[in-house]
Amino acid sequence: MIIGIGSDLIDITRVGKVIERHGERFLDRIFTAAERAKAERRAKNEKMVVATYAKRFAAKEACSKALGTGIRRGVWWRDMGVVNLPGGRPTMQLTGGALARLQALTPDGFEARIDVSITDDWPLAQAFVIISAVPLAKS
């Protein structure tokens, strides 16, 4: 059963301007170490670095909407991180207030699954997040 849906669309150049203006302070405040490492692996192409950050920013916004809180009520930027599953499919790794909110939304006898779709087509980045409750496997 679906327990939350969120989407976000962002101008990649806007993210680039914020990074230029605030640099490390912005990056440290918003992105996890894993997200920063992924973006910086693309360092040979500045547009790809900024697009990588923009897609992750959009995914965090979409996830916060799917959680029903936005970036408030104890859910903060670094509580949500885009990670890739072994097959490469993106998902969200939640901690802190975001994880607490997810646990509160997930009914007993179910586990949460977070599906993420991220894309970019310069100058836009977009993300969709669907949070589902999946019945626990019977032992």
Curated annotation (Swiss-Prot):
GO biological process: fatty acid biosynthetic process
Keyword set, alphabetical order: Cytoplasm, Fatty acid biosynthesis, Fatty acid metabolism, Lipid biosynthesis, Lipid metabolism, Magnesium, Metal-binding, Transferase
EC category name: transferase
Recorded superkingdom: Bacteria
EC code(s) of this entry: 2.7.8.7
Catalytic reactions of this protein: apo-[ACP] + CoA = holo-[ACP] + adenosine 3',5'-bisphosphate + H(+)
Main localization, broad class: cytoplasm
GO molecular function, one term: magnesium ion binding
One Pfam family of this chain: ACPS
Residues annotated to bind Mg(2+): D8, E61
Cellular compartment(s): Cytoplasm
Entry GO terms, CC: cytoplasm
Cofactor(s) listed: Mg(2+)
Function: Transfers the 4'-phosphopantetheine moiety from coenzyme A to a Ser of acyl-carrier-protein.
Family to which the UniProt record says this protein belongs: Belongs to the P-Pant transferase superfamily. AcpS family.
Record NCBIfam families: acpS, pantethn_trn
Protein name: Holo-[acyl-carrier-protein] synthase
Species whose genome carries this gene: Bradyrhizobium diazoefficiens (strain JCM 10833 / BCRC 13528 / IAM 13628 / NBRC 14792 / USDA 110)
